[in-house]
Amino acid sequence: MSEAEALEECPVIVGTAGHVDHGKSALIEALTGKNPDRLEVERRRGMTVELGFGELALPSGKIVGLVDVPGHAHYLRAMVQGATGIDVAVLVVSAVEGVMPQTREHVHVLELLGVTHMVVALTMCDLADAEMIELAELDVDDFLSGTVFAEAPIVPASSKTGEGIDGLLAVLDEQVSACWDACRDRVERSDAAPRLPIDRCFTIKGAGTVVTGTLHDAPVAVGDELMALPSRTVCRVRGIQVHGDTPRALPGQRVALNLVGDGVSALDRGEMLGVADRFGQTLRFMMTFTYLGREGTKPRVLESGARVHVMAGTAEVVGRIMLLEGEAPMAVGETRTVQVRLEDPLPLCAGDHAVVLSYSPVMLIGGGRVLLSRCRRSRELSAGERALFAALESGDTAGGVGAWLALQMLPVTAVDVADALDLGVGEVDAALRGLVSQGSVRKLAVGDADYLADAVVLDAAMDALAATLSAMHAASPKETGFTPGAVAHAAWPAADDGVAAALIAEGCSRGVCAAEGAEVFDPHSAAAAARVVREACERIVALLDEAGLDAPILPEVGEQLQLDRDTMTRALRELSLNRSIVKVECDVALSAAAEAHARELVAAAIEAAGGAATTSVLREALGVSRKRAISILEHLDAVRFTVLDKEAGGLRSLR
């Protein structure tokens, strides 16, 4: 079967949602002719408590996967697991009862899981008169108006009489077609690896272990070797079913995999299958979190450190929601970037959606999308990290790649970027082409390897190389040079051999260093040159100290001191590294003492103004021109000494 033919088979998952006893299973039986209740207890109780799966043929000829999830409040976990991977939701609402608690809860879950297409099936119309049906439609319309499903079509139907079923199928076909292109796009990601959250695991006599789930990210084929997390069970795919035997399944399809390998019989719901080294698990991640509060209870804030159940894929782990440093508790309806700390590992990738339940009693309280699947243990974000999360939240891949590179201390490979951000290498390469052409990212080639670095990070690495060589020559004035390993270890202790070689090659191309034979050296390493630079540093600092906050621009400093360009450049580099001077503009620097004095003046002015002051007040306190004052104030903002509140009319306060 060709991939094009398989696409017409089922890359879209349709799932039901709705309150208990509103007729979801009966509706599916009317649509498909099959009863989704697969457990004896379900048939006896007349409700779905586990996950029912099947297929649905639409009028256009498309065959889509169908998921029926439980509506009872006690089975919220099963509902979340079943809703994971749904592309189009069928919200089932009884025309007799209208919107009920689990109706609301299920819609919230669908929003949190990123579902955007919905059809509302107004069921049991055979038990309601025209007025009741109209009231139910108004009730549904009013509820959905505050959600992403505000435009969802509402179709009255009766599973018992068959009235409206054909119309429902036609509308559902339209919704499936609306998300068809996106489903095709996920199939065509050539550099992705498959992931399968396991929602069922059972044994078939004569075949062995079978697991089912919704396939994510990439195709899987017979013969593929997979690994399960967190158990790390290694297995091989012996057979695949997608509404019948097939050699290959596509992402977005409901699949059953027949697995062979040691330990496969112990696999269970909650584990995730994937390609070893192409996916991982985490104990900490960053996410965009929407706090819903608890349905039907008095609204209350969410405190940092709240213990919760985190559900992603089909897994559930206990953890804590950590608000960022200095943030107030979350009010109901708020959306923020938060850190989630888990008590056990959770298989997760950036872009996945997670649902959060309160610890006890277990109730839906929120969820959202994962921004970064692995992060450091800190609630205080730097400006660079905030820029990274803003880019990831907006879906700006190039911005996210650039922001992540700006946070690294050394060059990295495209694979490093892809692993950190859970992107395909092709996506990273496309983003890097634009960043390199803009000049914000530099590419370093050594042999067959390509390394990448933020331009500012690379400049800092070159500064470190220059300072290291200067120090090594000063400590060993008789040495003509040093081994690359010794230089790299001193300049960049964390660099591996490949990164070190790339940085030294870059240093040679810039004239920062030179290499001859097995030695690396400063081409200007004569003792006299070193003394000249030291003396230049002393004279520059003395001049800047005397000038205070009204220091001349750096080219004028060089002219006044009669320093040649090379000496001036080397002196400024050394002074910046040892923090004797502080640049407030590209061509303006203050001595460390002057910058400290500026801080004192600004702090005093802000305190005198009652905790916040305008630029005009601060300029008067600094006693310099408006242009210089703005440069100094923006520098103090950048180093997090002050903070500018644009919404408050440009007032600055101390951090």
Predicted regions and their residues:
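Conserved G1/Walker A P-loop phosphate-binding module
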Residues: S2-V69
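Residue-level signature of catalytic and energy-coupling elements of molecular machines
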Residues: D21, L27, G46, L66-D68, ...
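Conserved Switch II/interswitch segment of TRAFAC-class P-loop GTPases
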Residues: V69-H74, T84-H106, E111, V115-L135
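C-terminal effector modules of nucleic-acid-centric enzymes and ribosome-associated factors
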Residues: T16, A128-I133, D142, I154, ...
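Alpha-helical scaffold elements adjacent to nucleotide-binding pockets in ATP/GTP-utilizing enzyme cores
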Residues: L27-A30, Q102-V109, L135-F143, G167-Q175
